[in-house]
Amino acid sequence: RISLLDSNGKKTRFLFQVKTALRLDNMLVHHARVESFRPPAPYDAVLSRAFASLADMVAGCRQLLAPRGCFLAMKGAYPAQEIAQLAPVYTVAAVHELSIPDLDEQRRLVELVIRNSGEAP
C-alpha cells in the first residue's frame, strides 16, 4: 500500500482523481498536516519531497516510521550542512544522484535510517 499525505486540499483532490482514474486500489490519499497525522500502522518508508530540512523532516515524521524503516528525502545539491545537523541516532545509508530528463539541475535522494530503534531522537 502507498499512502500520500498533503495538507493542501487542492493537491489531495487531484491525487484522489488520479487514484480513481487509474484505479489505483493500493493507494490512499490523506488530507492532513504531517504533525497531526497518525497512521493505523507505522510505515516501512517515509518519502518527503523538499518540505523541510532533514532534521525538521525526521523530527516531524518520526511517528510515521516503523522501527526498522527508512526516511527518503528529495534534495537538490548535496545537503552536507543538513546532514551535519542530524541527531546522532540517524545514519545516512546512501545519497543517490538522480538524473531527471530535460532538467539541468542537481537532484538527490537521501536515505536515512535510525541506528538503534530503542533510542528516541
Q: Each predicted region: which residue ranges?
A:
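Conserved SAM-binding motif I beta-strand of class I
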Residues: 1-6
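Short alpha-helix immediately C-terminal to the canonical SAM-binding loop
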Residues: 11-13, 79
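Conserved SAM-binding strand-loop segment of SAM-dependent methyltransferases
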Residues: 23-34
